[in-house]
Amino acid sequence: MSDVAQRLTELRKTLHEHGVRYYVEDAPTIPDAEYDRLMRELLELEAAHPELMSSDSPSLRVGGRPLDAFESVVHEIPMLSLDNAFDDGELESFYRRMTDRIQAVQHSAFCCEPKLDGLAVSLLYENGVLTRAATRGDGMTGENITENVRTIKAIPLRLQGADFPTRLEVRGEVFMPKAGFEALNARALKKGEKQFVNPRNAAAGSLRQLDSKITAQRPLAFYAYSVGVIEGGELATSHYQRFLQLKGWGLPICPETKLVTSLAEVKAFYQDILQRRQFLAYEIDGVVIKVDDIQLQERLGFVARAPRWAIAYKFPAQEELTLLNDVEFQVGRTGAITPVAKLEPVFVGGVTVSNATLHNADEIERLGVMVGDTVVIRRAGDVIPQIVSVVLERRPENAKSIVFPTRCPVCQSDVERVEGEAVARCSGGLICQAQRKEALKHFVSRKAMDVEGLGDKVIEQLVDREMVSTPADLFRLRAGELTILERMGPKSAQNVIDALNKAKQTTLPKFLYALGIREVGDATALNLAQHFLSLEAIQQASLEQFIEVPDVGVVVASHLLAFFAQDRNQQVINELLEQGITWPALTAAPVAVDSALAGKIVVLTGSFTQLSRNDAKAALQALGAKVTGSVSKNTDIVFAGEAAGSKLAKATELGIQVFDEQALIEFLK
């Protein structure tokens, strides 16, 4: 090894060690000036000898060249969100659900930690070196932010020690400490630049900079809170012990994290953090409680979007008084008329709030609110602003009643309210400009047709200029036409056309979701596609056939039937197909028609030890069974595993056949 290479190795090792002491252990052993001198020497040597550059060099923290866009990263293990509890009763219900499922939870410890208000990220270490970082995104797919994350000094580019797995995914929160946020905004104010609203927005904006040099200048921090992929090694079977392992490898862990042994201690931890919240160095909006035993976590499993073994116990929403100046009525994609309160701006829950939803006419009546009232505004869960009450003693003499419109405020069509529904709707359909805009925004959204470059502002201009009326009109646009729009040059216009052409190759679930059928989300669209296999079959299905689809009840089935019964909707579909929208054909898995389960409606409940729930479902469907998520009088068989709960009780009450896991295995042979 040459003298230069040896010196580079020494410098990197020394800077790594001092970085851990400073950012992880909070116990620096050299002055900042000495650290800076070593870093300058490293930068100079690497600049003079680029052939000796290393992917884990501390110098990478200063940032690289700007990116054109972020690449997508598919998470090998989904990054799910957490369910919330807002009071002790909901926390106790969470605990009871777990103990009803698995009694051993009663004897488990719980790992408790503050719920940081930042941005969730995934860090992938291969042979101890940070090779990729990604945002959480939608939980399934995030964005590659490796270059930006390398600039965060608290995140090690190389793990310490030698006992870590060969592939280790560390998950945690990138956030901006309060002091760093205040200093950042002070600099922005001095320069006459726009200030950030809160530390979370500042952290998110900093992390998603295409130029990592900008990120490097931002005071970002990181705390690890879990792991994802583990290959080529093993971790402790305790969540808390895994934290200690991560800390030993150089990853920072929230110092407030605590292991407790009872629900009472969980509540005490929550109250302690709540009382000290304002004195912490970072913003939090609650605490996270996790079952500590990893094996119990695995047995408890997950629901669709969250683990059963963890919950976020949110702090009480912060409330403030403000004036209700006016009420505007907005029209949504499905024609829903929503009253929006226009408020005297007030700072609450970390943001300035000037609007709040009043939901519907029933809510206005319940509150007894009038324009001119002083109202109590709350950010429910510290997220959604809402009016919770009226201060009647402050009502002025000139307060005005809120009159719900009988005609659409946009197109003047009649406003209708279906009996039994709280929502009033414009009857104008796509002749209503507001519905048209929202329908088109939905159509091009990421989970739908995923057309890049067609943002809300562009859609609004296209509708206002009467350039598009239906989704099919989008595919008739030409680049030359788009250049008349604001901020749309020839290159941007061509990019939009290219994106539209690319979007023509889609999937049946995405196409169904893009149509904007009431209460048909992306998961329901996927179930419909997998059940019927073709658009034609869906268009011709009856109410009874729709109800056979997993998670489709009478209400959703009625919406589907009504949608496909309308000639104008069929015309929109035909026009889209004429524009060249296609998708790969779907084929059904082979079904054993002579199976004893063929045509039977089956429900799985409880946890199974010999196969996963998904494997059992797939095997049953291959035998011709229809697997649904709830027990009803139409259910033929229930297979009950360990800790089966309410579904088993209902099946017994209805006299439905119930079999255990061993019987399920026999059926599948």
Curated annotation (Swiss-Prot):
Q: Its domain of life?
A: Bacteria
Which Pfam families is this protein grouped with? BRCT, DNA_ligase_aden, DNA_ligase_OB, DNA_ligase_ZBD, HHH_2, HHH_5, Nlig-Ia
Binding of Zn(2+), residues: C408, C411, C426, C432
Which cysteine pairs make disulfide bonds? Answer: none
The positions flagged as active site in the entry are K115 (n6-amp-lysine intermediate)
Q: Name one GO molecular function term.
A: DNA binding
Q: Which UniProt keywords apply?
A: DNA damage, DNA repair, DNA replication, Ligase, Magnesium, Manganese, Metal-binding, NAD, Zinc
Q: Which NCBIfam families match?
A: dnlj, PRK07956.1
Q: Which protein, by its recorded name, is this?
A: DNA ligase
Q: Which organism is it from?
A: Vibrio cholerae serotype O1 (strain ATCC 39541 / Classical Ogawa 395 / O395)
